[in-house]
């Protein structure tokens, strides 16, 4: 069953007098916060691209990664604006379709990020075979995850939160992760292998920058898994939204990675002189 339910995205000014709006004000604030903070991805991606261009960095794969990150931001805005986050289990709603587009680009961005790190670490002729095997493996994981997502949306018409959510529907009321979301995490995990395998080959400053990026991403992942999109946490007198924090910390990770890429490129140029 297909149910398209796009409605106007309202501002704080006209949310209450608008007829037909069934969402609570807290839910509206949560989704509105998610929309606004989501643009941090785009800003960080654009700033990152500008930094790499100014530094005349020629590594095309990082530009592709940042470009995907900026597009992912736009698709995520659509995810949070579709009918204020409404899901109906068993119904192919606009929100569910929006989540498909959003999750697809999230997975593609994660895949591109892992591939970029692999291409960064394995550049010598001796490591090309290892790099290609790694890229094929990560790409296979990406295809599997997108297949699972497609099954969830277009066959099940639902994305239950099996991990940490007890199988609850993806309605933003509880924390937890769906199969495709867990698959996205699995897609990113090979980065840990890349870091461990190349840790001693990096300079001290490269290591610390990368450790910072991984640490921030880990904190962001834990925070967003604890609360649903519609939940306003009790922290800070009810002014804390977990998913919005995920957006902002994710944007911070983007910039940290850009600084790491620039530092690594600069170190190589200095060593070649």
Positions of predicted regions on the chain:
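Alpha-helix capping and helix-coil boundary motifs
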Residues: 59, 171-174, 194-203, 207
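Membrane-proximal helix-loop-helix units in multi-pass membrane proteins
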Residues: 90-195
